[in-house]
Amino acid sequence: MHKFIAAVAALFLSPLAQAQETVHFPSLDGTTRLDAYLYRPAGEGRRPAVVGLHGCSGMFSRATGAIAPIYREWAAELNRHGYVFLLVDSFRPRNANELCSVQGFDLELYRSRPKDAYGALSYLQAQPFVRGDRIGLIGWSQGGGATLFSIGNRSLGRPATLPQGDFRAAVAFYPASCNIERQPSDWTSRIPLLVLMGAEDLWTPAAPCKTFLDAAIGRGASIEMQIYPGAYHGFDAPNQYRLELPAYRTRAGVVPIVGTDPAGRQDALSRVPAFLGKYINMP
């Protein structure tokens, strides 16, 4: 019995299962001191890393106040593959709760998030346990839109100099602003990008995003796109039953629907690490 208890205790105290560490650093907007949550994988030595940008409802569960399961599970998955994961809170340091509703949306805050991404890159590059030239970026929903604004050749956040290099790769889950109306007409990026979307997503529809990305590919961007049949917004969340969100009705009158798609989620759990590994771990 004592051995069993010790084994269970060791499991929960292992580096792989350790709780996140809260850290702070400046956004490159010049005024905001950001909060972020650092998850480190087991083992010693310098590791590659990933910056995470949450969606428009923030990174915390409305029900529990804890970091939402979708981000905790991705943190664990990325740690399992050897990545340090830094989840950036763009909202609470600016006294914002959500940017999903028409009433709550703040364009200035949204467009400042690429500066948060590059503030996070700078923070990670200064850490002795991170390989500063091997860092990726992942964004969900509005954080996915911020990812597009970050990695474009005319980035809203990129500083003039990057001594240890830029992001090596980026992933955008069902990104906002993924269309020709919200992005520059000549948008392209030197950073390889993976975009994952649900075919039934009413909030950030796949069709206009595909049109936009196809045009960027034609201009030389390296982009992979995966559209999951039958999947809604937030398909990669764990155990999220299908749910309508009337409080976040769009200006066009669309009521968003979120929900887990088991097949899409499982594919993403393998596709994302494979994509990151291809570009972040290359010589």
Which functions belong to the PLM regions below?
Residues 34-37, 46-126, 239-258:
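Serine-hydrolase catalytic machinery in alpha/beta-hydrolase-like enzymes
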Residues 109-189:
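Primarily recognizes the serine-hydrolase "nucleophile elbow" in alpha/beta-hydrolase
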Residues 14-16:
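N-terminal signal peptide c-region/cleavage motif recognized by signal peptidases
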Residues 19-45:
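N-terminal cap/lid segment of alpha/beta-hydrolase-fold proteins
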Residues 189, 195-197:
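Short beta-strand/loop motif that positions the catalytic acidic residue
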Residues 205-215:
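Short alpha-helix in the alpha/beta-hydrolase fold that links the catalytic acid
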Residues 200-204, 233-234:
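Acidic catalytic loop of the alpha/beta-hydrolase fold
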Residues 222-283:
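C-terminal catalytic histidine-bearing segment of alpha/beta-hydrolase fold enzymes
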